[in-house]
């Protein structure tokens, strides 16, 4: 089987024998039930392939669709004038790059359809091209814009400056927003010349929207009819890749059901509508099946720089961000607010819908899967704590240590990690800041160990346990103190009976008291005790 990893050209996939998951019934429905759409999906989720498929369809390339659902659905294969604008691969942090990109695009189209001498701005010139294309072919124009938001995301919160035509200094971010708003405004005036428009991207901007200049597109990002338009459903995975899953199961020496469970925990969990259809991350699952290994493929391709910049302003506890219900207005429309980056985190694919409350039309948001949870928390921890070295190797060592039940080594690993955090990050003068740093630091560190079941501040009959980590062979029950003693922490675990619920559990139970010094910013006291309950 040939896996289309990194291939976004529909024609190449079909001509060269790569596997293609048939989405053309959804494409047919999309085309015949509206004409101006917007779709938001995370990076590497198949948006560019969708654009390429639509381009081939509207160009009437029927031979590429042989054997697919749309071959039977479409009775007329017409060749529409297609205008494909792709913002991928461009660096828009350079002043003038956006104008240059749009200028080149419009000039190329004018070579085909002619230039209207009365049109001066890029928007007016593009509108004239659309009109000429309609008149020349007798068919409405098709406009496909891939990653429409990249010119904004590249410069968002960078503080980069440029100069306007009058020599006034201004933010490059504002300049790009103005250019795009003017360019897209042509769609409203050119409505009669348009057959179909689709804009894809990661983020839907609000208030400062580039969409305000033209007919509001139909946002299908949370439309359950098109939830499977990008990504791989569980049904598609099991029907198309059954043999590959069996091969992975053999390699890992587990049953087929166990292998499906591991793939699901690692790469599944995306939901884009109230229907809660399970969608697998296509980039990760295809890489995993191809290489027959479970690894963090999507996260390794890099974290979006715009998100890293926004998180530098983020002052919320991640524990309070996840596992909560939100109205759609809180996470769908991004308002360029660095103090409330929830929409950016959600739309970038680091949070997803886990439940829908029909009565309040609100959504429970949480991490989609283990790959994303581990990667995102590690990214936030590195940004917040700024340790001297990347936490990745440290996390692997901690996971292996906890699998072995080595509490002494675990103490050394945790202590050394805290010691690696620069003093400037650890030093807190205000008591409230000391407490927040203490709590949030332990939360981030524990959350990075996502291979296991981690329970933070779990309520029990006798009180609230700071942290419980469950591994296949061991259960670790932690109580943390700040400027106290490990003995005091251990005593609390025993007196409150935090281990009581594991009375019938065959695993070894470890009770761990840990004291954190706000003076040094590190662990200065640790006591552990194995317990048979």
Q: Can you annotate each of these PLM segments?
A:
Residues 142, 474-476, 510:
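Structural motif
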Residues 133-137, 448-472:
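Active-site metal-binding core of divalent-cation-utilizing nuclease and nuclease-like domains
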Residues 165-178, 482-499:
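Mg2+/Mn2+-dependent nuclease catalytic core
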Residues 43, 204, 471, 481-484, ...:
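A short beta-strand motif that forms part of the nucleic acid-binding face
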Residues 1-434, 449-450:
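Phosphate-binding site recognition
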Residues 501, 505-533:
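Domain-level recognition of nuclease-like catalytic cores that cleave nucleotide substrates
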Residues 442, 465-482, 496:
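Conserved catalytic cores of phosphodiester-cleaving nucleases, focusing on short active-site segments
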Residues 183-190, 343-351, 440-448, 492-512:
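Metal-dependent nuclease catalytic cores in nucleic-acid-processing enzymes
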């Amino acid at each position: 089987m040939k896996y289309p990893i990194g291939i976004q050209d529909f024609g190449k996939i079909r001509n060269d024998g790569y596997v293609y998951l048939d989405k053309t019934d959804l494409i047919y429905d999309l085309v015949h039930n509206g004409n101006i759409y917007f779709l938001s999906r995370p990076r590497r989720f198949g948006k560019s392939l969708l654009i390429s498929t639509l381009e081939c369809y509207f160009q009437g390339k029927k031979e590429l669709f042989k054997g697919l659902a749309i071959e039977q659905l479409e009775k007329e294969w017409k060749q529409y004038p297609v205008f494909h604008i792709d913002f991928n691969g461009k660096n828009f942090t350079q002043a003038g790059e956006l104008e240059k990109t749009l200028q080149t695009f419009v000039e190329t189209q004018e070579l085909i359809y002619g230039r209207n001498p009365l049109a001066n701005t890029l928007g007016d010139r593009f509108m004239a091209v659309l009109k000429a294309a309609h008149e020349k072919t007798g068919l409405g124009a098709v406009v496909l814009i891939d990653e429409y938001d990249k010119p904004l995301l590249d410069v968002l919160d960078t503080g980069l400056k440029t100069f306007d035509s009058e020599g006034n200094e201004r933010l490059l971010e504002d300049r790009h927003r103005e250019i795009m708003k003017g360019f897209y405004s042509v769609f409203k005036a050119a409505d009669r010349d348009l057959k179909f428009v689709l804009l894809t991207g990661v983020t839907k901007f609000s208030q400062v929207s580039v969409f305000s200049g033209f007919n509001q597109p139909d946002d299908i990002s949370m439309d359950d009819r098109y939830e499977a338009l990008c990504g791989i459903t569980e049904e598609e995975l099991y029907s198309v890749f059954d043999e590959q899953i069996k091969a992975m199961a053999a390699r890992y020496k587990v049953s087929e059901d166990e292998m499906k469970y591991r793939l699901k925990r690692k790469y599944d969990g995306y939901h884009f509508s109230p229907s809660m259809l399970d969608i697998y991350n296509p980039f990760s699952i295809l890489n995993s099946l191809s290489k027959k290994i479970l690894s963090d493929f999507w996260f390794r391709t890099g974290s979006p720089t715009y998100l890293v910049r926004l998180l530098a302003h983020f002052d919320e506890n991640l524990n309070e961000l996840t596992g909560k219900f939100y109205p759609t207005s809180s996470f769908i429309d991004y308002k360029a607010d660095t103090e409330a980056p929830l929409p950016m985190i959600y739309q970038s694919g680091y949070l997803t819908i886990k439940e829908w409350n029909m009565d309040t039309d609100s959504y429970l948001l949480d991490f989609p899967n283990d790959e994303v949870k581990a990667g995102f928390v590690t990214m936030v921890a590195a940004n917040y704590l700024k340790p001297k070295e990347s936490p990745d190797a440290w996390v692997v060592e901690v996971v292996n240590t906890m699998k072995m039940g080595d509490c002494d080594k675990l103490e050394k690993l945790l202590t050394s990690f805290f010691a690696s955090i620069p003093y400037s990050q650890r030093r807190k003068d205000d008591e409230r800041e000391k407490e927040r740093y203490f709590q949030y630091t332990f939360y981030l560190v524990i959350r990075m160990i996502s291979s296991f079941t981690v329970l933070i501040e779990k309520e029990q009959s006798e009180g609230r346990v700071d942290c419980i980590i469950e591994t296949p062979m061991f259960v670790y029950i932690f109580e943390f103190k700040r400027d106290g003693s490990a003995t005091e922490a251990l005593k609390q675990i025993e007196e409150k009976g935090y281990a009581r619920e594991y009375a019938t559990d065959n695993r070894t139970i470890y009770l761990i008291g840990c004291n954190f010094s706000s003076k040094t910013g590190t662990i200065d006291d640790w006591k552990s005790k194995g317990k048979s309950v």
